């Protein structure tokens, strides 16, 4: 395992993200605990010492699973991260209540790393509003040893992140960004990394494989990979890209099965950043594919808890993208037709509640209307 220095610590270069644990019957809220425990144990015994969870992951069950299975190991033998769920504005006045409950769920007296979760356009004003006292409370917990390192994650624009840094930057020790070779330009990740480098803030990476989208390659992108590094796996290219980005300390991957976990750990046995024209060649070919592709959903499921109709939004977006990419066909209409009528895109009421929490800023209501018109249901 490659290790990175962070202050006085040595962190595994790869961390286990606990947002996409194995689940039962496709239900995101029902974690397959036996499979998850096996993954946690394998990660722990094969060099991973950083585990990342959050209040809302797996409908609130990720922290419970983290606590149940990590607590079997000495507390000083691993690093645990969680986050304050400010992506939901109704939580802003509940920081103490939520923090105390998180400690209970995770069966720990402290968090090694704690984050303001998802700083973006929809919550920046609330995060910075002194009436909630969020920063003051978290700094007090740090003073009391219940938070060892304080940081933030962000899906917002460069301008929003700069506002956050202007207000709280001197207290931030790390920043978690959506970073991969697809988003280097598409989501302005390059500019965000430069902002962190300038501020001297280490970068934590989320979505290194873009929700699994970068685990496969085709066309010119695949040909380029095969020509440049024929021995490297497609997911390996995503991690080698990140090993090339200045300021990256931690790469978090939300792995869903043992096969993914073992493969990624194997990749992180070595540090092999891209060289020569590999970096730009990879990005250029991905940019071209992105221009041809559909909506950039990562299936994070933030949207589903904010849909009053209970629509399976990530699944519908995936089918929409498939329908667009193939220029029609029968697969999407067949799949949607097999769904209960109340789960189809035509049932979207256009409230845009989902759009308020979408990290990718997808215009979901417009997609639903477009999809409905295309397939007639």
Q: What are these language model-derived features?
A:
Residues 1-78, 122, 137, 143:
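N-terminal binding-site loop/beta-alpha segment at the start of enzyme catalytic domains
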Residues 6, 16, 36, 43, ...:
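Conserved, mostly hydrophobic/aromatic
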Residues 20-34, 83-93, 122-127, 221-232:
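Active-site mouth loops of central-metabolism enzymes
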Residues 29-43, 91-107, 156-166, 234-240:
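Short, acidic/polar
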Residues 104-126:
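Active-site groove signature of glycoside hydrolases
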Residues 119-298, 302-311, 315-318, 326-331, ...:
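Beta/alpha (TIM)-barrel catalytic core signal, keyed to glycine-rich beta->alpha loops juxtaposed to Asp/Glu
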Residues 295-310, 345-361:
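Local cysteine-cluster metal-coordination motifs and their immediate loop/turn environment
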Residues 325-353, 377:
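Short Fe-S-cluster ligation motifs
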